[in-house]
UniProtKB/Swiss-Prot annotation:
<dbReference type="InterPro" id="IPR001247">
    <property type="entry name" value="ExoRNase_PH_dom1"/>
</dbReference>
<dbReference type="Pfam" id="PF03725">
    <property type="entry name" value="RNase_PH_C"/>
</dbReference>
<dbReference type="Pfam" id="PF01138">
    <property type="entry name" value="RNase_PH"/>
</dbReference>
<dbReference type="InterPro" id="IPR015847">
    <property type="entry name" value="ExoRNase_PH_dom2"/>
</dbReference>
<keyword id="KW-0540">Nuclease</keyword>
<dbReference type="GO" id="GO:0003723">
    <property type="term" value="F:RNA binding"/>
</dbReference>
<keyword id="KW-0271">Exosome</keyword>
<dbReference type="InterPro" id="IPR027408">
    <property type="entry name" value="PNPase/RNase_PH_dom_sf"/>
</dbReference>
<dbReference type="GO" id="GO:0000177">
    <property type="term" value="C:cytoplasmic exosome (RNase complex)"/>
</dbReference>
<comment type="function">
    <text>Catalytic component of the exosome, which is a complex involved in RNA degradation. Has 3'-&gt;5' exoribonuclease activity. Can also synthesize heteromeric RNA-tails.</text>
</comment>
<comment type="similarity">
    <text>Belongs to the RNase PH family. Rrp41 subfamily.</text>
</comment>
<keyword id="KW-0378">Hydrolase</keyword>
<keyword id="KW-0269">Exonuclease</keyword>
<dbReference type="InterPro" id="IPR020568">
    <property type="entry name" value="Ribosomal_Su5_D2-typ_SF"/>
</dbReference>
<dbReference type="InterPro" id="IPR011807">
    <property type="entry name" value="Rrp41"/>
</dbReference>
<comment type="subunit">
    <text>Component of the archaeal exosome complex. Forms a hexameric ring-like arrangement composed of 3 Rrp41-Rrp42 heterodimers. The hexameric ring associates with a trimer of Rrp4 and/or Csl4 subunits.</text>
</comment>
<dbReference type="GO" id="GO:0000175">
    <property type="term" value="F:3'-5'-RNA exonuclease activity"/>
</dbReference>
Length: 243
């Protein structure tokens, strides 16, 4: 969240944003499940201009052995941005942001998984950001959840994800990169729609209590929209688009 001055009109007098969307409109979301042959499960997502690939391995033996948990399986997650994912070449080594997002996604996914059915094993989630455009952690979380379902990992529900934020003193859905850099607040949310449970909520910026409530409600509404795309991706994968 930058809060920087910008010459771009983020929100015009008709309530239209800089990319032509309305206040409560998400960017285009497309998800394809089962795109990798060598992973146990996989998914590819385009969320606006974000392009992200998620691959799953496991349940499998845990290495190193000291990480084994006798009563349950463990989830490990690596979120990585390719050097060409942003306009200025990114160094290949993991950044503090990548390490933080890896941890955030892991903790957002864990409540959805029945890891207790696979004690002494690990499920590994690998996320590769091919192109980033604001909201990549939400896009990555949504793709990872579809990939876990594609891998056949028992789940209580899928985790959907979307962000809302404050731009030009207005609460808007699904903040893009330009809005993120110049906006006032950004709130990514992870949500399990069938269970009506939030698994992730973060806030970068400052909101009043009323703005916070409206922002969270709008983000959850966005999650529900993304959830429909997630379900369609799995339906297309296993039933050829049938119900």
């Amino acid at each position: 969240m930058g809060g920087r001055d910008t010459d771009v009109v983020l929100l015009d007098e008709n309530g239209i944003r800089c990319d032509g969307r309305k206040i409560s409109e998400t960017r285009r979301v497309e998800i394809t499940a089962g795109v990798l042959n060598n992973a146990n499960g996989s998914a590819y997502i385009e969320f606006g201009d974000n392009k992200i690939l998620a691959g799953i391995f496991g349940p499998r033996d845990v290495h190193p052995k000291h990480m084994v948990r006798t009563e349950t399986g463990i989830l490990r997650c690596r979120y990585h941005m390719s050097p060409f994912s942003v306009s200025e070449r990114k160094k290949p080594a993991p950044s503090r942001r990548e390490i933080e997002i890896s941890k955030v996604i892991k903790e957002a996914l864990e409540p959805s998984l029945m890891l207790e059915q696979f004690p002494r094993t690990a499920v590994d989630v690998f996320i590769e950001v091919l192109q980033a455009d604001g909201g990549s952690r939400c896009a990555a979380l949504a793709a990872a959840s579809v990939a876990l379902a594609d891998a056949g990992i028992p789940m209580r529900d899928m985790v959907s994800a979307c962000a809302a934020g404050k731009v030009a003193d207005t609460i808007v859905l699904d903040v893009n990169n330009e809005e993120d850099q110049a906006g006032q607040a950004d709130m990514p949310v992870g949500y399990m729609p069938n269970l009506d449970q939030v698994t992730l909520i973060q806030l970068d910026g400052v909101l009043t209590p009323d703005e916070y409530s409206r922002c969270a409600a709008m983000a959850i509404d966005g999650c529900k929209q993304v959830y429909e795309v997630q379900k369609k991706a799995l339906s297309d994968r296993f039933f050829g688009g049938g119900e």
